[in-house]
UniProtKB/Swiss-Prot annotation:
Protein name as catalogued: Imidazoleglycerol-phosphate dehydratase
Taxon lineage: Bacteria, Pseudomonadati, Pseudomonadota, Gammaproteobacteria, Moraxellales
Record's catalysed reaction(s): D-erythro-1-(imidazol-4-yl)glycerol 3-phosphate = 3-(imidazol-4-yl)-2-oxopropyl phosphate + H2O
Swiss-Prot/TrEMBL keywords: Amino-acid biosynthesis, Cytoplasm, Histidine biosynthesis, Lyase
Enzyme class: lyase
Length: 202
């Protein structure tokens, strides 16, 4: 991990294993820019929702063992992106900490609630109407989010409240996630550098 600039909340993370080689550069206070190349086009499409609707600048490049399947790439991209957020958030002073958002996409409606609690937890309910979106296995979304929350050290509640089209269901989830995460990562000018916890730490 290389801290490019904590003042500007910018971080670069490199994670190499026998299964994947990943580089992520993240700017929490960006404008939704960046280049995505995970090797899995539908995953790129979903991470694009995070950067555009969260206004995070994200560059990600992954060389994964896609000849086996997408699993390692999707999970490890979640892990590495989660590590980047944890590092970029630093000591979490002044953070709003909590974020929530409802996002519709046509017939689909999703709610996401985020707590930058320091306690990893994923509570996810998406009643997908089919097992695959194109060639993408929908089971891999839970692997992405589990990897993310475990390493971002956050509690995440995801609920798709209604939806008939699986593409709409997951895209509304990622849009809501982006907006909720953006809210939680914002600096509250009234907090004056304090920690949003009665314990004094997150």
């Amino acid at each position: 991990m290389r801290n490019v600039s904590m003042t500007e909340r910018i971080i670069e993370v490199v994670r190499n294993t026998n299964e994947t080689k990943i580089r992520v550069r993240l700017n929490l206070d960006g404008s939704g820019q960046g280049t995505l190349n995970t090797g899995v086009p539908f995953l790129d499409h979903m991470i694009d929702q995070i950067k555009r609707h969260g206004l995070f600048d994200i560059d990600i490049h992954c060389d994964g063992d896609l000849e086996i399947d997408d699993h390692h790439t999707v999970e490890d991209c979640g892990i590495t992106l989660g590590q980047a957020f944890a590092q970029a958030l630093g000591d979490k002073k002044g953070l709003r900490r909590y974020g929530h958002f409802y996002a519709p996409l046509d017939e689909s409606l999703s709610r996401v609630v985020v707590d930058l609690s320091g306690r990893p937890g994923l509570f996810m309910d998406i009643p997908f109407t089919r097992a695959r979106i194109g060639s993408f296995d929908v089971d891999l979304f839970s692997e992405f989010f589990q990897g993310f929350v475990n390493h971002a050290l956050m509690t995440l509640h995801i609920d798709n409240l209604k939806g008939k089209n699986s593409h709409h269901q997951i895209e509304s989830v990622f849009k809501a996630f982006a907006r909720a995460l953006r809210m939680a990562c914002e600096i509250d000018p009234r907090a004056a550098g304090s920690i949003a916890s009665t314990k004094g730490s997150l």
